[in-house]
Amino acid sequence: MTERTLVLIKPDGVKRQLVGEILSRIERKGLTLAALELKNVSDDLARQHYAEHADKPFFGSLLEFITSGPLVAAIVEGPRAVAAFRQIAGGTDPVEKAVPGTIRGDFALITQDNLVHGSDSPESAAREIALWFPGEATA
């Protein structure tokens, strides 16, 4: 069954010119890019996206980071797309959890500046796709 997930290549990935490398890894895994946009993120969109972190001490720095420059937002499709992308992304902590061979394991050092975001469940993917790509069907 085909599944959809939201992938963000965060401002650090864009600034470091890793967009092509990251998209290539997604496609080499067998996933398909269904939509792709370079965006400057508004404070409102950032707050909605990270709403579950609103009461955490790092929320302000997270908003500052995600709005610090352009990012790439993509809808990625394929069998088990959510789990497949999270596998190639690697653990959230790029040093302690992400293994070499993953995007974060190969290119990131800091937890917040960890290059990519991927939805953590099909339900989150549907919510996030609706937020980042209004009007897109989430089938």
UniProtKB/Swiss-Prot annotation:
GO function term, MF aspect, one: nucleoside diphosphate kinase activity
Highest taxon of source: Bacteria
Record key words, sorted: ATP-binding, Cytoplasm, Kinase, Magnesium, Metal-binding, Nucleotide metabolism, Nucleotide-binding, Phosphoprotein, Transferase
CC cofactor: Mg(2+)
SUPFAM superfamilies in alphabetical order: Nucleoside diphosphate kinase, NDK (SSF54919)
Active-site feature positions: H117
E.C. designation(s): 2.7.4.6
Residues spanning the signal sequence: none
UniProt xrefs under CDD domains: NDPk_I
Catalytic activity: a 2'-deoxyribonucleoside 5'-diphosphate + ATP = a 2'-deoxyribonucleoside 5'-triphosphate + ADP; a ribonucleoside 5'-diphosphate + ATP = a ribonucleoside 5'-triphosphate + ADP
Listed GO CC annotations: cytoplasm
BP GO annotations: CTP biosynthetic process; GTP biosynthetic process; UTP biosynthetic process
Subcellular location: Cytoplasm
PANTHER family: NUCLEOSIDE DIPHOSPHATE KINASE
Known function: Major role in the synthesis of nucleoside triphosphates other than ATP. The ATP gamma phosphate is transferred to the NDP beta phosphate via a ping-pong mechanism, using a phosphorylated active-site intermediate.
Family, similarity comment: Belongs to the NDK family.
Name this polypeptide is given: Nucleoside diphosphate kinase
Name of the gene this protein is made from: ndk
